[in-house]
């Protein structure tokens, strides 16, 4: 603080307070009355424009959907920082100018200094955040949405204000806040601590200026390099340049307005004896008034250079002429905002539910299939025991290879013509050992009618060592309206006769093809099954589900015959039981 002669010291209108006599002996400013009146009017205009303009900026960002982005969130935060000085310090400054000094308490002086520091430091930090946001938007556009998402932007905003508070609080203990009659306000006095003064100025002013200058330099280089590219919309390019220029002008105005105050502060702190008497009082007053005037310039710059802000300003001015309409529109906008957020959350929940349902439906086929069906071993399966891939060459199927077991009610006719039902239950696949190496089948164009097929044969002997004959689908006859998947298992007996002769099956009707030798599969069994020449078989396939618990066959053991079935779409092996009364063998089959 500059020293003044004793003759300039005199009593003021200050009165004693509980915090001490503030301003009992202060230097009288040597300003002419006209200058004081001019400064008073300028500060009144500054306060009014500051409050109205920054309020309109906040309303514009809140109401206009085009202005609701991460960059303008920092613009609204900058407006809040500018409004702080217009709410508390500037009115007290006007009061001090009107009464000719400070006659308020020391606590109010401390609060004025604290709020002023928060406003100034908050403004420069928000300008730095705006510059970084513009830099990421133009120079790193691919990562912009990830870096400045809504959640991240809110975090950056909180961090900005936390850094502002941490930067100002040390001044409350290290630097002393005193009333300066040259500026009619309470400021930080760093005369007794020059090192701390230089550090504060570098952190609060110089370092942010370097960061902002670097960001805008890179942005300008990027804009010049991308001028008039092929396929670029000129309107969009012009809008980006205007937006960049708006933020750059805001930065320049802040630097120009606050640079004189910071320079004077550093000079007085470093060389107080030389500079104290050389700096006139009016220069201090002009420097601080220019700095204070910066708080109302930002809203004006937005309205001049940004078309979206300008349109919103006109809307707000029109609404101010009709307060009821303005309040109604404001309530409607708030309701629409909440409804939009609720709808967004509902859409997110619905999308998550649809994804969960799709995942559940994707696994329902496997989860709903019995384990004994899912573990059916097909010929050529690599996990089958004792398998020989070389001997099994099944033809690739055009349909799904998964086996779905359909129920089959097989009615057998005896020689006398009376039907005798044979109940067939499937056995678990774990009790049957299959050896696909001995099963050979070749598809043939043999058509088979379920209830009118007659077989002629004298002695047909089969030899099998506990084989699994699997079929995927059969082509149904007149009594069946859809193809059915079946799997047959032959459980070996105790006798092991050798193979004698094999008679080829010939259909009795002339409407069916005759099976040739290459069409018959060779199935070896460990017991002898004989089929009479007069056996009449009729197959009736139903659509009910097969029971999973095995049950016994009829009293008379059946003859098991392996018949290859081949149609235009399905080529499978089907096991058919012929219940003959004179058979001596007992067998269990799982279909």
From Swiss-Prot:
A single cellular component GO annotation: postsynaptic density
Residues covered by region (Disordered): 378-427
Main location: membrane
Cellular localisation: Cell membrane; Postsynaptic density
Membrane topology label: Multi-pass membrane protein
PROSITE patterns named among the record's database cross-references: G_PROTEIN_RECEP_F1_1 (PS00237), G_PROTEIN_RECEP_F1_2 (PS50262)
Cytoplasmic side: 60-72, 133-151, 218-247, 303-591
Disrupted-gene phenotype: GPR50-deletion mice exhibit significantly lower body weights in the weeks following weaning and by 10 weeks of age are significantly lighter than wild type mice. This is due in part by an increased metabolic rate. In addition, glucocorticoid receptor signaling is significantly diminished in mice lacking GPR50.
Gene3D superfamilies attached to this UniProt entry: Rhodopsin 7-helix transmembrane proteins (1.20.1070.10)
GO MF, any single term: melatonin receptor activity
UniProt KW keywords: Cell membrane, Disulfide bond, G-protein coupled receptor, Membrane, Receptor, Synapse, Transducer, Transmembrane, Transmembrane helix
The keyword Nucleotide-binding belongs to this UniProt entry's keyword annotation: no
TM region(s), chain numbering: 39-59, 73-93, 112-132, 152-172, 197-217, 248-268, 282-302
Membrane topology (Extracellular): 1-38, 94-111, 173-196, 269-281
Expression (tissue specificity): Strongly expressed in the brain with highly restricted pattern of expression, confined to a subset of the ependymal cells of the third ventricle and a population of cells in the dorsomedial hypothalamic nucleus.
Induction comment: Expression in the brain is highly responsive to energy status being decreased by both fasting and high fat diet feeding. Induced by TGFB.
Disulfide bonds listed in the record: 109-186
Family matches, as InterPro entries: GPCR_Rhodpsn, GPCR_Rhodpsn_7TM, Mel_rcpt_1X, Melatonin_rcpt
Function: G protein-coupled receptor that plays a role in numerous physiological processes including regulation of energy metabolism, neurite outgrowth or cell migration. Promotes self-renewal and neuronal differentiation of neural progenitor cells through activation of the NOTCH and WNT/beta-catenin signaling pathways. Modulates the KAT5-dependent glucocorticoid receptor signaling by modulating KAT5 subcellular compartmentalisation.
Family under the similarity heading: Belongs to the G-protein coupled receptor 1 family.
Assembly and interaction partners: Homodimer, and heterodimer with MTNR1A and MTNR1B. Interacts with KAT5. Interacts with RTN4 isoform A/NOGO-A. Interacts with TGFBR1.
Protein's name according to its UniProt entry: Melatonin-related receptor
Organism: Mus musculus (Mouse)
């Amino acid at each position: 603080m500059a020293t003044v002669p004793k003759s300039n010291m005199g009593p003021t209108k200050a009165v004693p307070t509980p915090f001490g006599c503030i301003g009992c002996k202060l230097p009288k400013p040597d300003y002419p009355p006209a200058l004081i009146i001019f400064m008073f009017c300028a500060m009144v205009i500054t306060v009014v424009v500051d409050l109205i303009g920054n309020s309109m900026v906040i309303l514009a960002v809140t109401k206009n959907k085009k202005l609701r982005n991460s960059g303008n969130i920092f613009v609204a935060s900058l407006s809040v920082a500018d409004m702080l000085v217009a709410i508390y310090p500037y009115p007290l400054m006007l009061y001090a100018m009107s009464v000719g000094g400070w006659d308020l308490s020391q606590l109010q002086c401390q609060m004025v200094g604290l709020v002023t520091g928060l406003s100034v430091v908050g403004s420069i930090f928000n300008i730095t955040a705006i510059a970084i946001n513009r830099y990421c938007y133009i120079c790193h556009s691919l990562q912009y949405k990830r870096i400045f998402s809504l959640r991240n932007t809110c975090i950056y905003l909180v961090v900005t204000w936390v850094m502002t508070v941490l930067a100002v609080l040390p001044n409350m203990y290290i630097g002393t806040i005193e009333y300066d009659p040259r500026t009619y306000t309470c400021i930080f006095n760093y005369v007794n601590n020059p090192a701390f003064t230089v550090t504060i100025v570098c952190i609060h002013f110089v370092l942010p200026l370097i960061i902002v200058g670097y960001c805008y330099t890179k942005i300008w280089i990027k804009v010049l390099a991308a001028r008039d590219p092929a396929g670029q919309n000129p309107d969009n390019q012009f809008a980006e340049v205007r937006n960049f220029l708006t933020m750059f002008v805001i930065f320049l105005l802040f630097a120009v307005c606050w640079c004189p105050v910071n320079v004077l502060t550093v000079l007085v702190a470093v060389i107080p004896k030389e500079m104290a008497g050389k700096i006139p009082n009016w220069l201090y007053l002009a420097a601080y008034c220019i700095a204070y005037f910066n708080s109302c310039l930002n809203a004006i710059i937005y309205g001049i250079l940004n078309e979206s802000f300008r349109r919103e300003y006109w809307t707000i001015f029109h609404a101010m002429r009709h307060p009821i309409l303005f309040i109604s529109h404001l309530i409607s906008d708030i309701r629409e905002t909440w409804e939009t957020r609720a709808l967004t959350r509902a859409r997110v929940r619905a999308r998550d539910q649809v994804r969960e349902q799709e995942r559940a439906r994707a696994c329902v086929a496997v989860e709903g299939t019995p384990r004994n069906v899912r573990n059916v071993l097909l010929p050529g399966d690599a996990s089958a025991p004792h398998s020989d891939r070389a001997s099994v060459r099944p033809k690739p199927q055009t349909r799904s290879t998964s086996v779905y077991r359909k129920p089959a009610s097989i009615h057998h006719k005896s020689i006398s013509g009376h039907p005798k039902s044979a109940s067939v239950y499937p056995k678990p696949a774990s009790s049957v050992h299959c050896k696909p190496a001995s099963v050979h089948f070749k598809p043939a164009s043999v058509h088979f009618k379920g209830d009118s097929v007659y077989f002629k044969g004298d002695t047909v002997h089969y030899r099998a060592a506990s084989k699994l004959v699997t079929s995927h689908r059969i082509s149904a006859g007149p009594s069946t309206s859809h193809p059915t998947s079946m799997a047959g298992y032959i459980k070996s007996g105790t006798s092991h006769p050798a193979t004698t002769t094999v008679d080829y099956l010939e259909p009795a009707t002339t409407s069916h093809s005759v099976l040739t030798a290459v069409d018959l599969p060779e199935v070896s069994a460990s017991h002898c099954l004989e089929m009479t020449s007069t056996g009449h078989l009729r197959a009736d396939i139903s659509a009910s589900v097969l029971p999973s618990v095995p049950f016994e066959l009829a009293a008379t053991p059946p003859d098991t015959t392996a018949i290859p079935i081949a149609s235009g779409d399905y080529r499978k092996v089907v096991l058919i039981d012929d219940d003959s009364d004179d058979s001596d063998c007992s067998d269990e089959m799982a279909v």
